[in-house]
Amino acid sequence: GGMIKRAALARALALDPRLLMLDEPTAGLDPISAAAFDELLMDLRQQLGLTVIMITHDLDTIFRTCNRVGVIIDRRMTSDTLEGITRNPHPWIQSYFHGERARRFGQEASKNGT
């Protein structure tokens, strides 16, 4: 799984893009492979000056790699910094980013100031 995703990323980067769009890039990867892919993506983004637009439901990836987040709620897009989104009072956003599954990531992000 991880090698296939890395090969797909390499093919996309061969075109020397300024914008990279990824759809669920860590889906199907075990946690260690997903973390390695996130690290690779962050390194490439920094080294190549890429703008990355990513669709993901992976909270690990969101908290590790994103500096801005967009969420579609009630057929409308809302976006902000990660900290701003996690403070949004909408019940779905609160449940998603502060629910049982998300608690440890939110606490980690708060500690890191992201």
Question: What is each residue range found by the language model?
Answer:
Residues 62-64:
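A short, surface-exposed alpha-helical micro-motif characterized by mixed small hydrophobic
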Residues 35-47:
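Helical segment within the ABC ATPase nucleotide-binding domain
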Residues 83-114:
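C-terminal boundary and immediately downstream tail of ABC-type ATPase nucleotide-binding domains
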Residues 31-33:
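Helix N-cap at the start of a conserved alpha-helix in ABC-type nucleotide-binding domains
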